[in-house]
Amino acid sequence: MNIIITGASSGVGFEAVIELILSGSHKVIALARSQDKLERLLEIAHGLNPDCQLFALKFDIVHDDYEGLQQFIASHFDNRVDILINNAGVLINKPFAELLESDFVEMLQTNFIGHVRAIQALVPLMPSGSHILNIGSMGGFQGSAKFPGLAAYSASKSALHTLTECLAQEFTEQGVKVNCLALGSAQTEMLEQAFPGYQSPVMAFEMGKYIADFALTGSKFFNGKIIPVAASTP
């Protein structure tokens, strides 16, 4: 499988990459904004599996030119993408009364528009049977518990959830499945920012493994689904 994952340099994205390279049967392109963190990812991955086919590229899904990414894909993947994992995301924890319009713009750009740009650029390279997996949040899941300070973040994730349902229908003829995992808490830097002092019962590597496994197999059973993945609240 040829797999691309965004937001790959930390948290559950980092752990999903590690899970995907262990078998040696997949080619993985890891995208993130931090070159230093990507180099650390490469070092750890090759330490675990010296023969892994992992290619890292410093890339901003919101602001960078996708022509460069497409050239990178052509050189490493021969213009074929089997799985796209849209994991990149940021979080602002701030009371609603203090939120600026720029805060909402930042959340929507990174957590929604960036994924729109990635899908538009890459779906032409995805054959029938491919899988787009969006990483959402329980914060944006309808009917879930909501928390003060996360209005902008939760709204941006809710937009990604709805996009998932829409694109599953639009890509029916092409044969590309689209699903979304609405993640609950996992012990990451982002969780610590949102809920200081809270200890999640789920470790980042456990959630990363779940994401990797679902990316590989979930499209056999689901399409257009927003699946809650939460063992606790948050």
Stretches with model-predicted labels:
Residues 173, 180, 196-234:
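C-terminal helical subdomain
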Residues 48-64:
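Rossmann-fold cofactor-recognition segment
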Residues 9-11:
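Conserved glycine-rich cofactor-binding loop
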Residues 133-159, 164-165, 169-173:
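Catalytic loop of short-chain dehydrogenase/reductase
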